[in-house]
Amino acid sequence: MKTVVHDLGKEQNENLLASADRVVFADGRYAPCQGCFRCWTKHPAACAMKDELHQACRVLGAADDLTIITENLYGSYSPAVKNLLDRSIGTSTPFSTYRGRQMHHTLRYGRHDLWKVIVYGEITEAEKATFRYMAERNAINDGFERSEVRFLENLSELEGWL
């Protein structure tokens, strides 16, 4: 299943659905992760906070290809997208395993194919390097086989990268 997470605005959902099975709009109106770990222990893969991100773990966990469209913020995801990713920690379990000679959490949903990040907005070369490294590490942590990062000068280029 191909899933797109974005912060572009709700009006973009219809356009993005043409190239994805599932679209999640990170509008920034959700409570941040409280670090209670109930999504790991008490209610596996379901957030204890009952809002629209309650099932985010299951939606992102089912994605074979995950595309994240985000505005650059100092070489990182926008706050709304970061909040959504934080709330999806339940895609893994509290147990640990070695992957590639590194310790990582055991995956609840198994391996995935592509973690793609499409970044828009002003960005420096240093921020690009930070973003590439972070996306690669996020992909490994969440069990994706590979990662890609694309930087757009303006949003009119977006359609060709989905």
Positions of PLM-derived features:
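A generic local structural motif
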Residues: 52-55, 101-105
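Short, conserved loop/helix-junction motifs that constitute active-site signature segments
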Residues: 106-114
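Short glycine-rich or small-residue beta-strand-to-loop segments that form or flank ligand, phosphate
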Residues: 64-71, 114-121
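Glycine-rich phosphate/pyrophosphate-binding loop and the adjoining helix
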Residues: 124-162
